[in-house]
Swiss-Prot record:
Belongs to the radical SAM superfamily. RlmN family. It comes from Parvibaculum lavamentivorans (strain DS-1 / DSM 13023 / NCIMB 13966). GO terms for biological process: rRNA base methylation; tRNA methylation. It comes from the Bacteria. This is Dual-specificity RNA methyltransferase RlmN. Gene3D superfamilies: 1.10.150.530, Aldolase class I. The gene is rlmN. One of its GO terms (molecular function) is rRNA (adenine(2503)-C2-)-methyltransferase activity. Its main location: cytoplasm.
């Protein structure tokens, strides 16, 4: 059996999608204090109460104010009437034979009775670490031709709370809160990668605020060295990302010349390779200790020649970098094939001999469409499938 499908419906307070109460998850500390001040808390209590709520949200994983017993019963009731701290709705959960887990999440729509859009989050367990792949948008505007998400039109940006909410929900599922019976030092989620659905730099403020919450030392406490933001090359935002977010940077490069990259990553027509690499050289904090990762999907007969490998080495000269070679993960209707494994190894050898670390990413979660480049909202997949069936039926001759 390729995968275990544990599809289930779990209705939560978030399911209604129309709560008029503002959600506290994802608010930075200053914004949380602003919300509590507007709520009516006196100035001399703001810092203390914000700290207590912060601890409840991000150290204990509470989804109900009643569990925040450091607050008075009266205050807990008033907070519950004014604010939401529930989780996103899990529509389905799938588990791969390799341990990878994927959650399809429904976001609030803001309209009573109307289901909200959906987004996917993936957890990848490895020896000694666990990586959570987080989405920043529903759909994407970039239409990268090798990426499944790129075939789904942008629906909307995620809020900071919805970005942080993916991490909170994953910690729930993995039993990673103190009450989950797990040693708090034995973390299952050790790394966060902003490599899910969407282009993070086209949702800059929400991604920035979410990662500020995630890296706060008194909450989820993930070091910025364990957080990687991947961009397809939104050049004007790269320097700002280094200054205001300061996490590790990954570039979806995938080609060594503008003609090829224009086809694979149409954004390249706006920000060509030379401009992108110049922005990388100037990325704040880049050094041999904080190298930029260049992602390179291996496409048979497109970008995988040994000449391409040599050109890649020349391009990245004088940039502290590592190169992540990604075997192409197929999806229905994709126009590409994965490079032969022998060719991938030869390509990696050229890069390695030039002095660059070039690990070949092991495909994870392919059987549940959770691997790199395979994410897409399930409702969009279903609509496409129904449309295909309808077109096929219409094409059948009438007896």
């Amino acid at each position: 059996m390729a995968s275990i499908d544990i599809a289930h419906e779990r209705k939560t307070a978030a399911t209604a999608g129309a709560s008029a109460r503002p959600h506290l998850a994802g608010l930075t500390r200053p914004l949380l204090m602003d919300a509590l001040k507007a709520f009516g808390l006196p100035d001399n209590q703001l810092r203390m109460r914000a700290g207590q709520i912060w601890n409840g949200l991000y150290n204990r994983g509470f989804t109900d104010f009643e569990r925040m017993t450091t607050l008075s019963k009266e205050l807990r009731g008033k907070l519950a009437d004014a604010f939401d701290i529930s989780r996103l709705e899990i529509v389905t959960e799938q588990k791969s034979v390799d341990g990878t887990r994927k959650w399809l999440l429904r976001l609030p729509s803001g309209i009573p009775g109307v289901p909200g859009p959906e987004v996917e989050t993936v957890y990848i367990p490895e020896e000694g670490r666990g990586t959570l792949c987080v989405s920043s948008q529903v759909g994407c505007t970039l239409t990268c031709t090798f990426c499944h998400t790129g075939t789904q039109k942008l629906v909307r940006n995620l809020t900071a709370g919805e970005i942080v909410g993916q991490i909170l929900l994953a910690r729930d599922a993995l039993g990673e809160w103190p009450d989950g019976g797990r040693n708090s030092e034995d973390r299952l989620i050790t790394n966060i990668v902003m490599m899910g659905m969407g282009e993070p730099l086209y949702n800059f403020e929400n991604v920035r605020d979410a990662l500020e919450v995630v890296s706060d030392g008194e909450g989820l406490s993930l070091s910025k060295r364990r957080i990687t933001l991947s961009t397809s090359g939104v050049v004007p935002m790269i320097e700002r990302a280094g200054e205001e977010i300061g996490c590790m940077l990954a570039i979806s490069l995938h080609a060594v010349d503008d003609e090829t990259r224009n086809r694979l990553v149409p954004l390249n027509k706006k920000y060509p390779i030379a401009e992108l690499l110049e922005a990388c050289r100037n990325y704040p904090g880049v050094s041999n200790a904080r190298r930029i990762t260049f992602e390179y999907v291996m496409l048979k007969g497109v970008n995988d020649s040994l000449e391409d490998a040599k050109a890649l080495v020349r391009l990245l000269k004088h940039i502290p970098a590592k190169i992540n070679l990604i075997p192409f993960n197929p999806w229905p209707g994709s126009p590409y094939e994965c490079s032969d494994w022998e060719q991938i190894e030869k390509f990696a050898d050229v890069v390695n001999r030039a002095g660059y670390a070039s690990p070949v990413r092991t495909p994870r979660g392919r059987d549940i469409m959770a691997a790199c480049g395979q994410l897409k909202s399930e409702t969009v997949k279903a609509r496409a499938s129904e449309r295909f069936k309808g077109e096929k039926a219409a094409a059948q001759p009438i007896a």
